[in-house]
Amino acid sequence: MNDTVLLAAHGLVRYYGARQALFDVDIVLARGEILGLLGQNGAGKSTTLQILCGALAAHGGRVEIGGHALASAARQAKALLGYLPEIPPLYRDMRVDDYLVACARVHGVAANAAAQAVARARQRCGLNDVGARLVSHLSKGYQQRVGIAQAIVHEPQVLVLDEPTAGLDPAQIRDVRELIRELGRERAIIVSTHILPEVRALASRFMILHHGRVVHDAPASGMRRLRVRTRHTPGAAALAAIAGVTEVTASPRGWLLTVDGEPEAAAEAFAVAAVAAGWGVLEIDPDFDDLEHLFMELTSGAAASAAA
């Protein structure tokens, strides 16, 4: 990730009649970041996304995309933005290629460049074999890929994805997540969801909304942990020396290892070290209790009342 800020939203406020739905929401996103926007149903996630995309007016605050103010330079700002709503905007009676060409033209891609733009988006989204098929004849997973393709056909710098894996089977979820990771290497992406595993699998940072307020905003790295247990105690120093481990904490059930990358890679490194040292591995398990506990603490009970 570099430090190029691609999306900056400050002080977003929104009312529905007399009810205030958003309270001074700030979001700043740099190239290479994937932000997981978490919240219960009705927390304000979709309202926030619609404001960021210019589909809904805010009653306060400002949004800049690639340095262009959405309020005063909407055309330039939206040219840098791709949006996948929770229900993809698909024309089911169109063929995939025809639909993507239409989307490219709507996004301002020149007529003589549309075919190349569609071919590029189709390739990235794994749609090369279905370009001539009707959208209605595709599986749910492929329709979701078409939805993502329409969001990237004009080469945006910022992607906003609302519940991108909703309704997919496990294999489709895996494929869509891998696609989002790949797209996130050169873009800034917001993934809105109420599904905690989505954040664990994708996000480099996560934000929790509750009743229209940001109640938490932090890197996801602190939540990537392994719980390990061995027959012979290795000691904290030996565990800290394992590649990818940034922090070691003792727990009643063994050790908690905070890692700076994918937990699977750290688990493999731990297993190799444990076998070499003869520690006797009893358990290697991703430990995500912290994220779930934090989410529940901030969105229910006394903590939620205090935050509101």
Task: Name each model feature, range by range.
Residues 262-308:
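C-terminal coupling/interaction segments
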Residues 72, 91, 197, 233-234, ...:
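Short alpha-helical
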Residues 31, 129, 230-232, 261-262, ...:
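Non-catalytic surface loops within mature trypsin-like serine protease
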Residues 1-13, 301-308:
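ABC-family P-loop ATPase nucleotide-binding domain
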Residues 4-9, 14-210, 214:
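ABC transporter nucleotide-binding domains
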Residues 102, 120, 237, 272, ...:
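Surface-exposed charge patches
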Residues 175-260:
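ABC transporter nucleotide-binding domain
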Residues 126, 244-249, 280-285:
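A short linear hydrophobic-aromatic micro-motif
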